[in-house]
């Protein structure tokens, strides 16, 4: 009805209090966002709470008038950092290395011929024993100690070589004996099988062989004769050159048989 009246209709205009992002017509305006607060520990001091409250209020004010950017949290006070991991100190490493050295057994190393004959192995033994004995040991004692260790290592090498050679000889003899026994048993089995086959062939008589052969020949001849008779009895159909068009019912079509 307002179109027929001279008075202008009153239109309620929306109040736009939010600030535009750009000074352009139709530009988007700032939006309000909801803020989530992470729970904090109750044992914090009053100073921390005051600083947190101040920063949170400032953050809320800024977030309420944010420009829609990806930065939601302006402060890192709400995040709880994990506890620092316990780092391994050099003292712990030294303790572990000492415990490993105590568990080391040099008896296993002496059995290896290569390590025992090498000069590096002898010098390592001498250095370890000299450190334990102290700095007051004389040069003569060290030389005697080196000679004794070298003799012991050589004796151990000779003993280990003798033991290994004896074991190898025993193993080879056992293997040869077992192989020989297996071969002899195999030969005997083959000979017995050949003898039994030859005996069974001799026991079969020629008359027994001729009987089934004759019966087989008779059966085969009967089958051949019966097949010939059946072929003679059945009349063979003769095909004409061209089939009649009509009036001849005696014509035998090939697909009917």
Curated annotation (Swiss-Prot):
Compositional bias (Acidic residues): 163-178
Biased composition (Polar residues): 72-94, 115-126
Compositional bias per record (Basic and acidic residues), positions renumbered to this chain: 102-114
Highest rank taxon of the organism: Viruses
Region Disordered, annotated ranges: 1-178, 194-248
Biased composition (Low complexity): 50-71, 127-136
Biased composition (Basic residues): 12-21
Family statement drawn from the similarity comment of this UniProt entry: Belongs to the herpesviridae BKRF4 family.
UniProt protein name: Uncharacterized gene 45 protein
Organism listed in the record: Saimiriine herpesvirus 2 (strain 11)
């Amino acid at each position: 009805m307002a179109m027929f009246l001279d008075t202008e209709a009153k239109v309620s205009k929306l109040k736009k209090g939010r600030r535009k992002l750009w000074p352009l017509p139709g530009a988007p305006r700032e939006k309000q966002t909801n803020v989530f607060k992470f729970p904090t520990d109750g044992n914090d001091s009053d100073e921390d709470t005051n600083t947190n409250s101040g920063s949170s209020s400032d953050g809320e004010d800024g977030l309420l008038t944010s420009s829609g950017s990806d930065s939601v949290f302006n402060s890192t006070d709400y995040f709880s950092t994990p506890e620092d991991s316990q780092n391994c100190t050099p003292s712990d490493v030294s303790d572990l290395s000492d415990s490993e050295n105590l568990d080391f057994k040099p008896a296993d190393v002496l059995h290896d011929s290569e390590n025992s004959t090498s000069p590096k192995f002898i010098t390592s033994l001498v250095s370890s024993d000299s450190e334990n004995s102290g700095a007051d040991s004389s040069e003569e004692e060290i030389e005697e100690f080196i000679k004794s260790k070298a003799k012991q290592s050589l004796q151990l090498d000779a003993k280990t070589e003798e033991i290994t050679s004896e074991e190898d000889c025993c193993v080879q003899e056992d293997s040869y004996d077992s192989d020989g026994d297996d071969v002899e048993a195999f030969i005997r089995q083959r000979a017995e099988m050949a003898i039994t086959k030859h005996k069974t062939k001799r026991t079969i008589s020629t008359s027994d062989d001729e009987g089934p052969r004759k019966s087989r020949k008779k059966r085969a001849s009967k089958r051949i004769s019966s097949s010939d008779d059946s072929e003679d009895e059945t009349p063979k159909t003769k095909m004409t050159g061209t089939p009649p068009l009509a009036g001849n019912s005696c014509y035998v079509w090939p697909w009917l048989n």
